Swiss-Prot record:
PsaA and PsaB bind P700, the primary electron donor of photosystem I (PSI), as well as the electron acceptors A0, A1 and FX. PSI is a plastocyanin/cytochrome c6-ferredoxin oxidoreductase, converting photonic excitation into a charge separation, which transfers an electron from the donor P700 chlorophyll pair to the spectroscopically characterized acceptors A0, A1, FX, FA and FB in turn. Oxidized P700 is reduced on the lumenal side of the thylakoid membrane by plastocyanin or cytochrome c6. GO terms for biological process: photosynthesis. GO terms for molecular function: 4 iron, 4 sulfur cluster binding; chlorophyll binding; electron transfer activity; magnesium ion binding; oxidoreductase activity. It is found in: Plastid, Chloroplast thylakoid membrane. This is Photosystem I P700 chlorophyll a apoprotein A1. Chlorophyll a binds at M684, Y692.
Length: 751
């Protein structure tokens, strides 16, 4: 008879939380900087307020205990979710209280979405445009109306109840944030239990989340949208619960519902093909993806993620161990391979965050490129303002996330990287090859820059000399993007070959016929030519320069030939101390700062390209005589010179925002003006020296002393790093708001 030792018995139930670790205490709220010994003493100079902002969320500097840092981050995530739910609730509330949603639902091709009405204080009611259907309000471009229709929302009452649900969820999130920091805080081992986390996130969030959405779409969205598409008045459509509990009602729309679950259990799944389709392309009634296709997609995704959520080994001895996977990952030329990466990713949340930001940023950019080619919601494709806004929004979000990845990778290198644990693994080998990588990348940037820009300069010169036959264009020296055209054609032909079950290709942008809704183009084949080939290489150039700056910042964050002990100076420092000239702007932080400007360049050119290309070659009206595009196909003729971009895009299309005064678009004119000012204001911070301001401040303080009104808190010029941070923030804010007002005034006027 064997008696198992007592410790094995006790291990069955793991206690992975600490009870009541931190008392709830509101007194800290009244003490700014309570987390830092220096800051909590209060301000002696104006630098205090800047340091307070810089360090308030930098949990690493407040404690070195990884468990405490993890708990703070975890708790802060719940707070973030609470804020998101409040924002969402506000959106739904505006839809319920201040919008023309019910009118839009009856005629989405003529009535424009609006969910905000400006109060008449001193003439502001000029901003309320006539959006159709007798409604005066601001035209919105967020895409919520289209999303709500796809969800099967048919009344403002439903929006009200959802808004209340959002507030309930927000309250639950705020409570959870408090509870899991003050009452039951997870232990470090819980945060480091990656297999359980993967299983729960994959199976729970992504698997069950997709399954729940697929279920909602099948039982609520599909029947309601089918009736809406057929022209049934929203007030006549049965309520969601009637479809849920009345199979006969569903069977009238989708006959397979009469058979119940029998086909599912007998594996005769083809019976369900009336609501799980594989049509491809767009619904000609709404200009959006077939909702039966998107249901099929979410059901398939749910199955994949539910399987994926059972792959990792936890309490039962089956499944993969992430540490084993990583350590087995060795190639013939990669030394120790991924050995040591498991330890990095379970002890450095900056490393983890850097990877997640890079992937999520890339995903956001992929989303923006899919949403115009395959508009997921009904009547989204013909709402040009919303299409342009969604593309621009997801591009910006992606750009910021990718720069954030560079930032947190740099912080990881400075604060968390331990060379002794990373001998000859992939990270160590990348660091040892960094000179070869950066110099090659630098060569690529120079090559792309000179060649892509050189094509434009050549064309501008030939154009100025009156020699169009010597220009690179579709009518003279052609540089056709043959590979892109081949990819387009391959996708267009896919239903016959690689996707035999699909009835059409994924998007009309590959080729085929124009999809028009209410006389407006939803999507049509996008022809690519010399002008696209040229701007594509400008995209390649700006993206490679952004990567060069960010990657150099990460790879040289700890040391360089110039400053071998850089790691000791920290993540951000202005220069390597007195007596070492030429060592300024070398910190990892400064690389993020510089990377932001090139990210701005990259994204600007992408959204300008998109805006002009769509107006020239896709968006427009359809009549018996064919398609009439907004700018009449001028992209191919004009976008191959710099002068063409300046004259026929920026200048020609800014007339709407410049002449918006006195119309409902006048707010965009004011934003355009104000944002230019904010942008120009940034240059004062970016081009000036700290000493200049310190001298000025001291003369102003002298004047105050003369008048005996000297302040108790001593004024100080911004530090070099603070000045740069303020500068780049205003540069980006000004640039983004300028672009936003320029785009919207233009597209709302002509689209």
């Amino acid at each position: 008879m064997t008696i198992s030792p007592p410790e094995r018995e006790a291990k069955k139930v793991k206690i992975v939380v600490d009870r009541n670790p931190v008392a709830t205490n509101f007194e800290k709220w009244a003490k700014p900087g309570h987390f830092s010994r220096t800051l909590s003493k209060g301000p002696t100079t104006t630098t205090w307020i800047w340091n307070l902002h810089a360090d308030a969320h930098d949990f690493d500097t407040q404690t070195s205990d990884l468990e405490e840092i993890s708990r703070k981050v975890f708790s802060a995530h719940f707070g973030q979710l609470g804020i998101i739910f409040i924002w969402l609730s506000g959106m739904y509330f505006h839809g319920a209280r201040f919008s023309n949603y019910e009118a839009w639902l009856t005629d989405p091709t003529h009535i424009k979405p609006s969910a905000q009405v400006v109060w008449p204080i001193v003439g502001q009611e000029i901003l309320n445009a006539d959006v159709g259907g007798g409604f005066q309000g601001l035209q919105i471009t967020s895409g919520f109306f289209q999303l709500w229709r796809a969800s099967g929302i048919t009344s403002e009452l439903q929006l009200y109840t959802t808004a209340i649900g959002g507030l309930v969820m927000a309250a639950a999130m705020f409570f959870a944030g408090w509870f899991h920091y003050h009452k039951a805080a997870p232990k470090l081992e819980w945060f480091q239990n990656v297999e359980s986390m993967l299983n729960h996130h994959l199976a729970g969030l992504l698997g069950l989340g997709s399954l729940a959405w697929a279920g909602h779409q099948i039982h609520v969205s599909l029947p309601i949208n089918k009736l809406l598409d057929a022209g049934v008045d929203p007030k006549e459509i049965p309520l969601p619960h009637e479809f849920l509990f009345n199979p006969e009602l569903m069977a009238q729309l989708y006959p397979s519902f009469a058979k119940g679950l029998a086909p599912f259990f007998t594996l005769d799944w083809a019976q369900y093909s009336d609501f799980l389709t594989f049509q491809g392309g767009l619904n000609p009634v709404t200009g959006g993806l077939w909702l039966t296709d998107t249901v099929h997609h979410h059901l398939a995704i749910a199955v994949l993620f539910l399987v994926a959520g059972h792959q990792y080994r936890t309490n039962w001895g089956i499944g993969s161990s992430l540490k084993e996977i990583l350590e087995a990952h060795k190639g013939p030329f990669t030394g120790e391979g991924h050995k040591g990466l498991y330890e990095i990713l379970t002890t450095s949340w900056h490393a983890q965050l850097a990877i997640n930001l890079a992937l999520f940023g890339s995903l956001s950019i992929i989303v923006s490129h899919h949403m115009y080619a395959m508009p997921p919601y009904p009547y989204l494709a013909t709402d040009y303002g919303t299409q342009l806004s969604l593309f621009t929004h997801h591009m910006w979000i992606g750009g910021f996330c990718i720069v954030g990845a560079g930032a947190h990778a740099g912080i990881f290198m400075v604060r968390d990287y331990d060379p002794t644990n990373n001998y000859n693994n992939l990270l160590d080998r990348v660091l040892r090859h960094r000179d070869a990588m950066i110099s090659h990348l630098n060569w690529v940037c120079i090559f792309l820059g000179f060649h892509s820009f050189g094509l434009y300069i050549h064309n501008d010169t030939m154009s100025a000399l009156g020699r169009p036959q010597d220009m690179f264009s579709d009518t003279a020296i052609q540089l056709q993007p043959v590979f892109a055209q081949w990819v387009q054609n391959t996708h267009f032909l896919a239903p016959g070959f690689t996707a035999p079950n699909a009835l059409a290709s994924t998007s009309p942008s590959w080729g085929g016929d124009v999809v028009a809704v209410g006389g407006k183009v939803a999507m049509m084949p996008i022809s690519l030519g010399t002008a696209d080939f040229m701007v594509h290489h400008i995209h390649a150039f700006t993206i490679h320069v952004t990567v060069l700056i960010l990657l150099k910042g990460v790879l040289y964050a700890r040391s360089s030939r110039l400053i071998p002990d850089k790691a000791n100076l920290g993540f951000r420092f202005p220069c390597d101390g007195p007596g070492r000239g030429g060592t300024c702007q070398v910190s990892a932080w400064d690389h993020v700062f510089l990377g932001l400007f090139w990210m701005y360049n990259s994204i600007s050119i992408v959204i300008f390209h998109f805006s002009w290309k769509m107006q020239s070659d896709v968006w427009g009206t359809v009549s018996a005589n064919g398609v009439s595009h907004i700018t009449g196909g001028n992209f191919a003729q004009s976008a191959n010179t710099i002068n063409g971009w300046l004259r026929d895009f920026l200048w020609a299309q800014s007339s709407q925002v410049i002449q918006s005064y006195g119309s409902a678009l006048s707010a965009y004119g004011l934003i355009f003006l104000g944002a230019h000012f904010v942008w120009a204001f940034s240059l004062m911070f970016l081009f000036s020296g700290r000493g200049y301001w310190q001298e000025l401040i001291e003369s102003i303080v002298w004047a105050h002393n003369k008048l005996k009104v000297a302040p108790a808190i001593q004024p100080r010029a911004l530090s070099i790093t603070q000045g740069r941070a303020v500068g780049v923030a205003h540069y980006l804010l000004g640039g983004i708001a300028t672009t936003w007002s320029f785009f919207l005034a233009r597209i709302l006027a002509v689209g």
